[in-house]
Amino acid sequence: MSVQLDPQGQLRHLVTTEGLPRELLTRILDTAESFSGVLGKSVKKVPLLRGRTIINLFFEPSTRTRTTFELAAQRLSADVLNIDVATSSTSKGESLLDMLRNLEAMQCDAFVVRHADSGAAEFIARHVAPGVAVINAGDGRHAHPTQALLDAFTIRREKGPLEPLTIAIVGDILHSRVARSQIHALLGLGAGEVRVIGPRTLLPRDIQRLGVRVYEDMDAGLDGADVLIMLRLQRERMRGALLPSESEYFSRYGLTEQRLERTHPEAIVMHPGPVNRGVELDPQVADGPRSVILRQVTNGIAVRMAVMSIVLGGHGEAPAEPIEEASS
């Protein structure tokens, strides 16, 4: 039984995009669209989660993800606590479950979890008290669902419906939790074609079973693509010499203006960050007119607001009327 859905099929935890119904994926994006309107106002708060407490529990360092989750919770008027795991009681020998029990005793409503171990978020979701939600902010090589959802949201805003689009994911697919989540989300939302491009040493052996087309040749994989999602090399997760050098990687798989010409004339360039300029992206492409990288960051706030409002607020339907501003 899925830990993510309650018996009525409503989202109670977000651990992965794998297996989520298309209707639910669409509802998240639609709800995010409604929150985007709020973020454009002078007062960027709504009172949906006033009185709720959300704890950011990050066992791995993060800047963009933790900050956007914190902003998203604050925009919903929730109270936010950031736990410094390096100085927490877990560093003094307390078990993870004991720490969770103590935090639950403080009447928290949700944990946003980032962890180096694959499966950590699901483990926590299966052991939290009833009524406490868990949102996966990235676990090992397993999943990063909110990144995938904000990428899908960005694509829909920039390019319209996903059905006719060819989307290419380029780089270190093997070690990327983002790539797996993107594939499940994009195909779940009906994307026309999803391609993965990378050297053989950075492609999972069974990746084709997910329904993607696989390319080792960068130029062939880029041909006619509408969306390019560039991924960084996950050096911290690599074991052994999987690549000769970063300069050779760039010569074969780096996105340059010349390579960009092989794509659709109106193709967009995306990256989940952090960007390694001169490794996966030429600086001129990263800063060029087709790059929507900074818009991804902005969209991440609205998407994470949507996820929080759904797991903590029930049905998560997009408001029929514009959301009213809170007084403060």
UniProtKB/Swiss-Prot annotation:
Sites where the protein binds carbamoyl phosphate: 64-65, 114, 144, 147, 273-274
InterPro entries named among the record's database cross-references: Asp/Orn_carbamoyltranf_P-bd, Asp/Orn_carbamoylTrfase, Asp/Orn_carbamoylTrfase_sf, Asp_carbamoyltransf, Asp_carbamoyltransf_Asp/Orn-bd
GO biological process terms, semicolon-separated: 'de novo' pyrimidine nucleobase biosynthetic process; 'de novo' UMP biosynthetic process; amino acid metabolic process
Gene3D superfamilies linked to this entry: Aspartate/ornithine carbamoyltransferase
EC number: 2.1.3.2
First-tier enzyme category under EC: transferase
NCBIfam families: asp_carb_tr, PRK00856.1
Name of the protein: Aspartate carbamoyltransferase catalytic subunit
The gene coding this protein: pyrB
